[in-house]
Amino acid sequence: MIVIGIDPGLARMGYGVLEVTRGEISAVCYGCIETSGKDLRASERLLKIHTEVGILFEKYQPAHLSLEKLFFTRNISSAMGVSEVRGIILLAAEQRKIPVAEYTPNQVKQAITGSGRADKRQMQEMIKRLLRLTEIPTPDDAADALSIALCHIHIMR
């Protein structure tokens, strides 16, 4: 079973692809889709994200998508961009009938470390350990996406 986790963002959207085989969880791939506000209009940035997410979905055929929920933020401009990206991702998933689960950052932290108050470094170390990686996944957005996918797998069990 393949689960894709996504940490939505307009400038940099993290993704992580995990596979569960006979109870074992492994990282298939992870990375980021980046768009630049300097080079692209907002609509072009959203189209790039939609296209690249579609390619991920077609390549890995996920059984589930897990997505970070938007939480309160003081930067309304950033929140609007993230909301637009979330809409694009939800659309791409619905077009392919991929079930979507959404988690808050605290839910993800609780599922991965047992504490909703874990810091970024603790989360990254746990992801490295739980997925038996040789190093902490980078950039941070990709590590966050792996943790969102892993959270979903733990909650499904």
Question: Which residues does each predicted region cover?
Answer:
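Phosphate- and other anionic-substrate recognition elements at nucleic-acid/protein interfaces
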Residues: 1-157
